[in-house]
């Protein structure tokens, strides 16, 4: 059993965060990291008929175990970047970018869900790499 690093921030999507947390937690120790060690607010998104955009509603709260600045990425087997609105803001955190670059430099598994790819794009680790994302993030990764 090894440790997996799960990234959160205010506005992270509930499903993108909770499902990996609990599923990976069945076999690994999941450590939650964020800009600061505190409680964060997750959000839920719905695709309502007649809307061109998703509707965002408050979801659950989720506590982080560590601040990005205190994370030694060498201690972890894998990295999970949930989607939602959080990546729009998290992608500018230099400590998170350091962590992401470590995982790519060491060829460790990285799971990027939905808008999580925005963090990878800013970290400049996916140039020439085929990735999946949602259509709205297409220009971030091209």
Feature map (PLM): residue ranges:
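Short, thiol/selenol-centered motifs that function as redox-active sites or metal-ligating centers
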Residues: 113-116
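Extended, subdomain-level signal for the structured scaffold at the beginning of enzyme domains
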Residues: 1-106, 118-130, 138-142
């Amino acid at each position: 059993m090894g440790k997996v690093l799960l990234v959160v921030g205010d506005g992270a999507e509930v499903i993108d965060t909770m499902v990996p947390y609990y599923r990976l937690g069945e076999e690994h120790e999941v450590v939650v990291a964020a800009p600061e060690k505190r409680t964060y607010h997750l959000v839920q998104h719905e695709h309502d008929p007649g809307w061109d955009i998703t509707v965002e509603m408050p979801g659950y709260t989720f506590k982080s175990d560590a601040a990005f600045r205190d994370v030694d990425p060498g201690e972890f087997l894998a990295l999970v970047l949930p989607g939602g609105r959080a990546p729009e803001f998290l992608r500018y955190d230099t400590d998170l970018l350091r962590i992401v670059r470590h995982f790519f430099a060491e060829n460790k598994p990285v799971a990027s869900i939905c808008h999580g790819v925005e963090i990878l794009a800013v970290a400049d680790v996916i140039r020439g790499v085929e990735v999946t994302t949602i259509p709205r993030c297409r220009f971030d990764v091209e």
